[in-house]
C-alpha cells in the first residue's frame, strides 16, 4: 500500500511539473511570422504578423555593412549582395519577396517600438572580432537609445 501511495504521489508530482513547464513554454517566430501572404523572412511585415498572433518574441538577424550601418537580413549573401562588403544603400535596395526593401535595424526597431512582442536579435558572425565588436556596440546603443532594452534578447553563433 505504501508503494502505491509513493508511486501515486510521484506521478502527481511529475504531472504537476509538466503542467507548470507547459505554462512557461513560449513561441518565438523565427525570422518573424513569414510563411504567410504578404510576408517575407526578416521583413517588417513578418515582425508585425508575429506580434498579431501574440508570439512571445520575433527573432531577426543583424549584419554590419561595409559603411558600418546595421541591417536586418538572415543570409550573408542575399540576391547576389554580400552584406559585410556592401553599403547600406546597396543592401537596402534589395526587394524582399513581399515587395518591401530589406530593412535597416533602425527601421525594424521603429516599427517594433509600437508592438508588444519581444525582440530576439541574432548578431550574425562577422569576418573579424573587431567588426563584431563594432556591431555589438552600435546595436546596444541603438536598443538603449530607443528604450527597448527590457524587450530585447540577444543571441549569436559567433566564434
Placement of each model-derived feature along the sequence:
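N-terminal secretory signal peptides that target proteins for export/translocation
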Residues: 1-2
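Sec-dependent N-terminal signal peptides
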Residues: 5-15
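Phosphate-group recognition and catalysis centered on beta-loop-alpha active-site segments
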Residues: 8, 18-159
